[in-house]
Amino acid sequence: MDWMWLLSGACIVFTLGMFSSGLSDLRVMVAKRSVENIQFLPFLTTDLNNLGWFYYGYLKGDGTLIIVNLIGASLQTLYMAAYILYSLERRYVVSQVLVSLGVLFLAHCYFTLWTPDINSRLNQLGLFCSIFTISMYLSPLADLAQIIKSKSTKCLSFPLTVATFLTSTSWVLYGWVQSDLYITVPNFPGIVTSLLRFWLFSRYPPDQPAYSLL
């Protein structure tokens, strides 16, 4: 049973390591008192994803999911608060947050009022969270296509790629051990996109010129 605790610990450490990548953006915003070219949407979508999986873990009684996503949601909320504080488009950003809160409220009403059966609630929430997670992992594909076109990986973060690969792999194993497809399936795309990034790093090293004269 010790190996299960080890796997759970790996999920927590690797996932929190991936979530903490936003600390570098936080330092930039605080130091320059500006959001620079930092995007707000990744913070918001990750926060929503964390809250969804937190509720799933709560319904399932899974301490690993609860811990990871509670801390993750707290970090994303911190990043969003700093972004709102230093953004010049504060009204637009706040409107996005309010719309998201409205969606969360409607989802809460649906799952608590119209889905009283705990198993149905768990299955529907698991399906929703899985689809949302898959879409997040696949969303950077357009950027990867642009990297192939420009033959430059300067905009990619190698440490974040490693963290994403380790996180996705640990959750695939965790879900497989627990026979939970809602955890296993949505993390496969994370492995695939990470392997694709590794290939791009080997094909187009960061110190390599983006274009050749030949």
Swiss-Prot record:
GO terms for molecular function: sugar transmembrane transporter activity. It is a multi-pass membrane protein. It is found in: Golgi apparatus membrane; Cell membrane. Keywords: Cell membrane, Golgi apparatus, Membrane, Repeat, Sugar transport, Transmembrane, Transmembrane helix, Transport. Residues 6-89, 124-207 form the MtN3/slv domain. The keyword NADP does not apply. Pfam families: MtN3_slv (PF03083). InterPro entries: SWEET, SWEET_rpt. The chain crosses the membrane at residues 3-23, 38-58, 65-85, 93-113, 125-145, 157-177, 181-201. Gene3D superfamilies: 1.20.1280.290. GO terms for cellular component: Golgi membrane; plasma membrane. It comes from the Eukaryota. Its main location: Golgi. Belongs to the SWEET sugar transporter family. Mediates sugar transport across membranes. This is Sugar transporter SWEET1. It comes from Xenopus tropicalis (Western clawed frog). The gene is slc50a1.
